[in-house]
Amino acid sequence: MPDELRLGAVYERSIAASLERLWENVHDWEHLPWVHEGAFSGIELEESGDWGWRARVGLAGGDETLRVELRREPDREVYHTRTLEGPGEGSDTIVRLIPRSERVTDIRVEFWLAVPDEQQAEMFGKGLLTLYARLWDEDEAMMVMRQEVIDGVRSSPARAGTAAPAPLALGPWSELSARLPLAVSTAQGEFRVVETDSGFFAHSVFCPHRGGPLGEGEIEAGHVVCPWHGYRFVLASGRGADGRRCHMAKPPRVELGADGQALLFFADDRIAEA
């Protein structure tokens, strides 16, 4: 490995998110293989704290892994992502966050590479520019949606204890399958109606973890999976299905009414039971 690092490229852009959202995203190691599934296949955390985090990260499309440390500089809006082991070992990506307004932050990313000559630095730098443009596009979309959830622009689930309204008609039961997935907006919140081998189910379109878009989540084995962090929830109960203490409110039921209509019934107690 060379004694010194070489600057491969510099990536600069504006992000439509606050400095607070940027730092939240930087510390959010869990999202890497989910939001960035085209780049990363998995992550195993070793340690994390206010300083940053250290983890083993699988690369998509193969068996290669990186041991990565992300570390903040004290009292500065700067962090380093260093490759401790694996492809690019010794390299240091330095990111500077520059707030421009309440909801706009500029970033400057410097790729300092452990390569023997300038030609290789330039070659790898070009690839990193393409990769990071995609990664920041994906992160920006996540941060914008996260801010909308916090601001209440997107409807959030009704609070526990809210009185149950009358059943909501969804249309003819015989035609429901053909209309799925079906988005339903109610005073109790926004839901998606889906079908599995066990029947019809409705679930909130917002993940209780960080407001992720469950309305875009995959339905697997009776669970809905959050596309941001991979949290899994049981469709029938709203309970977390992956051992993490994170649960949805008890979901409404989809049932056949006496008149042949599909009806959405809301429970009086909206908290999922153990």
Task: Please report, for each region that a protein language model flagged, where it lies by residue.
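Hydrophobic-ligand binding "helix-grip"
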Residues: W34, A39-G42, G58-E102, I271
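Intrinsic-disorder/low-complexity, polar/charged segments enriched in Ser/Thr/Lys/Arg/Asp/Glu/Gln
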Residues: R6-S14, G52, D92, V104-D106, ...
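Short, hydrophobic/aromatic-rich segments at coil-to-beta transitions
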Residues: G49-A55, P74-T81, S177-A183
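Short cysteine clusters
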Residues: C207, C226-H229
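N-terminal pre-ligand scaffold of iron-sulfur
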Residues: E20-E24, P33-F40, A133-A221, V234-L235, ...
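Beta-strand/loop substructures that line and gate deep hydrophobic ligand-binding cavities in soluble
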Residues: R82-L131, A262-L264
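Short helix-coil boundary/hinge micro-motifs
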Residues: L5, S14, L59-D63, R72-R76, ...
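Hydrophobic ligand-binding cavity/cleft-lining segments
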Residues: M1-G49
